[in-house]
């Protein structure tokens, strides 16, 4: 941005730097969206990781099992770690997206202003956020995987189910004690392989869909919810098998998985051979129910928070960045 535009962006709003306001907007959006779909996220993880107690029980049956054995709070098991992860993750993700977008425009002023720019900036931002917050995602999965109390397995008698970790800190300490730093980042490779296309496609489809909405309706909540829903749906469908691989790698120590020590794509092939290709899409229907409101709520809350915190729009940012580039490259008039 030029000096005047930068100063206006930095000082407008509640007296906070622009980057901090972007972090706040992203963090709030992530926390609200994640909590709204926590029960579906819990069941999806149990399906992905093939808990015997939930195999073939379906969505409603799984809800009943969780409620019977763990009560209402069982639907939110692991959500503390999930929110603890998603708030910094979403904050970094959205802020990094805005920053990378500005850097690309500044570094390549001739680049086309459109969804392709959002695809590139979103992909890099997603990778940045994953690397910074992955340990909390691992903890969230391990806490959600364990089931408290006795559960019924088919026609067999109820049996106690293991509860290895007592909470977030206990989980982190146990993982580090048993496997060191490597254990804390187990399964990050498929996360990165998945997040680069998913994050990029999510921003790409969102901005692409918004570009087809009439200008007078573009800032409405309904339009944002609709565009966000389609963006999340398409992005998740394309990258979902890698999410299944990641979950199974994360809980392999608890489930005696044959994936121990194997790479991402080797694990992908093994799951398809041993568990069937359908397992690569296990929980996808639940994920559709989760992703549609989650991404829609996330984008809507983020855009609304940007308005409340007076964060410049992407169009205003692009104009300011290009103005700065022109001012820096303008020839100095001769005296």
Curated annotation (Swiss-Prot):
Using the record for this protein, list the coiled-coil segments as residue ranges, or answer none: none
Q: What Gene3D superfamilies does the record point to?
A: Mitochondrial carrier domain
Known InterPro entries for this protein? Mit_carrier, Mitochondrial_sb/sol_carrier, Mt_carrier_dom_sf
Show the GO MF annotations. Answer: coenzyme A transmembrane transporter activity
GO annotation terms (biological process): mitochondrial coenzyme A transmembrane transport
What the entry lists under PANTHER family is as follows: SOLUTE CARRIER FAMILY 25
Q: What is this protein called?
A: Mitochondrial carrier protein CoAc2
- Organism per entry: Zea mays (Maize)
The root-end lineage is: Eukaryota, Viridiplantae, Streptophyta, Embryophyta, Tracheophyta
Give the gene name.
COAC2
């Amino acid at each position: 941005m030029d000096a005047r535009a930068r100063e206006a962006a930095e000082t407008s709003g509640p007296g906070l730097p622009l980057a901090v306001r972007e972090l706040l907007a992203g963090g709030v959006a992530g926390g609200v969206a994640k909590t709204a779909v926590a029960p579906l996220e819990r069941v999806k993880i149990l399906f992905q990781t093939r808990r015997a107690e939930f195999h073939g029980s379906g969505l409603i049956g799984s809800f009943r099992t969780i409620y019977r054995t763990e009560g209402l709070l069982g639907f939110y098991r692991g959500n503390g770690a999930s929110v603890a992860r998603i708030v910094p993750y979403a904050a970094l993700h959205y802020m990094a997206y805005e920053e990378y977008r500005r850097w690309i425009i500044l570094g390549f002023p001739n680049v086309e202003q459109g969804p392709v720019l959002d695809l590139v900036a979103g992909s890099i931002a997603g990778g940045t956020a994953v690397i910074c917050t992955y340990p909390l995602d691992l903890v969230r999965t391990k806490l959600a995987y364990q089931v408290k109390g006795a559960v019924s397995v088919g026609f067999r008698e109820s049996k106690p189910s293991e509860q290895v970790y007592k909470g977030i800190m206990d989980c982190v300490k146990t993982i580090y004690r048993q496997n060191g730093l490597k254990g804390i980042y187990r399964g990050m490779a498929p996360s990165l392989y998945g997040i680069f296309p998913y994050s990029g496609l999510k921003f790409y489809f969102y901005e692409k869909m918004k570009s087809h909405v009439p200008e007078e309706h573009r800032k409405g909540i309904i339009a944002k919810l609709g565009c966000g829903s389609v963006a999340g749906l398409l992005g998740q469908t394309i990258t979902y098998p890698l999410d299944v691989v990641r979950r199974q790698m994360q809980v392999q120590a608890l489930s005696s998985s044959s994936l121990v020590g194997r790479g991402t794509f080797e694990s992908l092939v093994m799951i398809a051979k041993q568990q069937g290709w359908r397992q690569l899409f296990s929980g996808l229907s639940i994920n559709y129910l989760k992703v549609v409101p989650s991404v829609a709520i996330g984008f809507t809350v983020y855009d609304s928070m940007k308005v409340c915190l007076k964060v410049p729009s992407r169009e205003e940012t692009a104009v300011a960045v290009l103005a700065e580039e022109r001012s820096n490259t303008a020839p100095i008039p001769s005296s």
